[in-house]
Amino acid sequence: MSDAVRLWVDGGSRGNPGPAATGYRIEDSEGVVLAEAGETIGIATNNVAEYSALIAGLEAAAGLGAREVEVRADSQLLMRQMTGTYRVKNAALRELWLKARRVAAGFERVRYVEIPRAENAEADLQVNLALDAAAP
């Protein structure tokens, strides 16, 4: 296991709120996929799904023994709230923000990188696979 990993996260909902899911992909520094997953989370907003994906991905990275994580996501709100550029005003998001910060505190270093949507295709795929599998 690599001490440093890259973590792509994405969350989505079909409707806002609507059926929602999380997705993440973890790679080592050479691009080898260490883990990827998508999971439905019930009815939620897109922002709740984004935070839930971050938490799930960070917990998975911790489970792999990572010490440093570079988080990559296309959610401007998520990335800017996690770096402190934006304040967290919504009470539901604040709880998730606090949980994400607690999980992130277990690493030696966490870096947040906001990326274009096109660069987050693998995490987005996990979200859509989970939502499609749960659809009636």
Residue spans for each PLM region:
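RNase H-like nuclease fold core
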Residues: M1-V48, S52, E59-R67
